[in-house]
Structures are given as C-alpha cells and as structure tokens.
C-alpha cells in the first residue's frame, strides 16, 4: 500500500467536482495504479483492474464491505463529471472521470475517459503523494483540500506556509457556493472535519484561521512532514543546501536504472516472467525515475526491494 503513489496534473488538483468519500477513494486508488509516463495511452493502458480482496487490503476494509462499497461507488461514478477552468481564458471543460466499468465475480475493471488523459499522463506541472496518507480520511472534502494545499506548497517550493484563499473562492472550488451561508456551519461541517483528517491521518499539520467581519478570507497554516518524501524537488534542494550527506549504497543510481530498464525490457519481450507485484513495483519505480531523473527519493526499503528483484533476474 505504501508504494502506491498518486500523480495528478495541477489543473485536476484544483478542479471542481463533487464526489462522495468512497467515490474519491476509488478514483485515487485507480489513478495510483496507472503509469503516468506513458505517451498516448491506449484503452488498455487507461484501464485499471483489481480484485475485491485487493481493494479491501488497500483500504483496510473487509472483503464483504469492499464489494458493496465498490458497486455503489462505481455506479455513481459513471454519472459524475469534473470541471476544469483555465484562468487565462473564459470558459471551462466538463467531462466524465470514467466511461466504462465491468464487474465480475472477483474483480472490477474500470476505464478512464479519453478527455481526462492529459491530466493523468505525461504531466509537466503536477502533484504526487502516497495513497497511504489519504486513504483513512473520513470527510470527502479532506482529500480535495489536501491536494490543493500540496499543490500550493509544491509551487512555492516549501514545506511550510500560510496559504490564503477568499471564502467565495474556497466554496466555489468545493462546489459549496450555495451552501453553508453561515460561517459557523461551514466551520463545523467542513473546516473542522478537514483539519481533523489531515492532522490525524496525513503527513500534513494544519491550522485554519479566518479574517474579516464577516469572514471573507480563510488562512491555512500548513506544514508538510519532510520525512515523507512527497515533494521530491524540495527534498533534493534541501539536502544540497544543508550540506547533508546522501546515504551511500552499494548500487549506484545509474547502474540500478540500467538494471531496471533491462528487466522491464526482458519482461516485455517475454524473456523473463515477473510476478504481478514485481511488474507493478518495477513499473512504478521507472515512472518515478522518469519524473524525477534520479533515485534519490527512494526509501531504504524501496531500494532494497528494487535491488533484490533485479538481482533475482541477474540484472545487477
């Protein structure tokens, strides 16, 4: 579970949509199973499938609950849309998240719509985070605000900031412009649950303040745990600035990457047969390397796992 990473374009992170908690978690799980480095993904490459047991394990729920949750969330998801606005031009895009789903006795297959592909593949400005940090959120707005705050921190190249947003803009982003006219109700049902989720389950610490009489501005005092290695560019810069030594490893990055490329190529040409875990893990490692240009973001556990797999097939 800790290896699943969500990649999203910045535009998608601040888009307008209204999904339930379970619909949001289903989407994030599916996004984390994609390979974001693929160019011009085919229908097969934008298709995600997993068993109900796998989903239950990923989300820490029972197998029986997994089927019911997935069935309801998937049916509703087929009717949901996402709205993306370009601040530089008037107008906006509206499209579906997915356009096909298939249930069998053991697994779910879901296909992302073609219109959403530019916001999930070949990304230039994007956010990324471990699915582990949001899977336990209890409020549907918590995941939205987590992504928005992460985008702001990433753009500012910092792990700590006071991020301001007008109350109207905040409600517009969450499609709440016609709800919670009294601030105390918004605070009770939206802001406090968001703070509780982020402070309890995620790698963010959050305090929400307000300004104005009546309130017209929200101030999010947010701090990202730098040890979680989610903002890779920031981490690399801080290591250089602080003069910290990068832990030495037996296998150099270039040697490790060459071994990774050979292994994936040999698997593609059927010279070797990877297990499902190995195939997903190596594909994820290649995706992250392509996006970051190095393996400096690897945890020791990830590096050891990668080295063991490559050594198993004689590629290092």
From Swiss-Prot:
Keyword Secreted appears in the UniProt entry: no
BP terms from Gene Ontology: DNA replication initiation
GO molecular function, one term: DNA-directed DNA polymerase activity
Bridged cysteine pairs (disulfide): none
Record keywords, A-Z: DNA replication, Plasmid
Keyword Transmembrane among record annotations: no
Family designation: Belongs to the initiator RepB protein family.
Name this protein carries in UniProt: Replication initiation protein
Name of the gene: repA
